[in-house]
């Protein structure tokens, strides 16, 4: 009875709060690819941070951790010349969105993403940026001790170059000269949103984190939209099933990915025939392998080198009206100290765009990282 009285009193005194809380409970707001409501995010992050600090106090990190970005500037005339020379010969077998201009557009996200790493992850030993002989305009001598550019030709066999297929590029990340055993892979649309400890990615005993999503690969296929990422993940599962009794149905969260060079080498040793079979695909196809974002993390898990961990990552399409809502929410969260671990400002389909989506993105990133 007292509980009912309190609710009735709340309704009379603060009807807007009453209905807000009622709706949030009945229809919880979700910003991530995890089974957690927005109201749970801050507590989850705080709990994991406290645990990481306890572990940090009782252990010493045994190895360095690097960061790897892949990046392309689709407005570069030299890159465009190569693309227009080769792409038409491979378009017939390419997958959904493989040739969409959004895949190759540069919105200067890399600048903000790299600077977020420098600001919020100062323990990172070195940053490598993998490109097709391109250089970000902002990258000057001031960064030379911390950042190294890696050209595709430095790591990818020349018979597969040029390539415009991110799955192919990601299959060679372990070839980066002087790369540490433990590294974190970023796309340039993934951003650190707050200070993060090394233990969020790798424990002192070398165990990596695997950030699983609650999404279902089976449900994705049943909906009928067959993306190259989905097909490449399903192909990866078939390879994993040759060695492990798996029932994998979860992709990973669209965020950064802790990886190990030794697990790359194991994958190449076990699956060399299948890997060599998809490397000639200069554009994404439905016959690729999803290396960095699926095969290697799950291989690490089944080899006892990774364990599940939570990463609160906001994921949205920068061309969607929802992006404006997310920008406002992220700025508000930052102001009250409840920002997520990361966010992914994704761009994959240029067919539908809000007005001034690029300026909206610039304005938000400038405000968030100012």
UniProtKB/Swiss-Prot annotation:
GO MF term (any one): transferase activity, transferring phosphorus-containing groups
Signal peptide: none
EC identifiers of the protein: 2.7.-.-
Cited InterPro entries: Stealth (IPR047141), Stealth_CR1 (IPR031358), Stealth_CR2 (IPR021520)
The keyword Transport is annotated on this UniProt entry: no
Record's keyword terms, sorted: Exopolysaccharide synthesis, Transferase
Keyword Ribonucleoprotein: no
Any one GO BP annotation for this protein: polysaccharide biosynthetic process
Note: Stealth proteins are part of a protein family that is conserved from bacteria to higher eukaryotes. Family members were first identified in microbes as proteins that help pathogens to elude the host innate immune system. Microbial stealth proteins are involved in the biosynthesis of exopolysaccharides. Stealth proteins are predicted to function as hexose-1-phosphoryltransferases.
Protein's job: Part of a capsular polysaccharide synthesis locus.
Homology family: Belongs to the stealth family.
Protein name, as recorded: Capsular polysaccharide phosphotransferase
Organism per entry: Actinobacillus suis
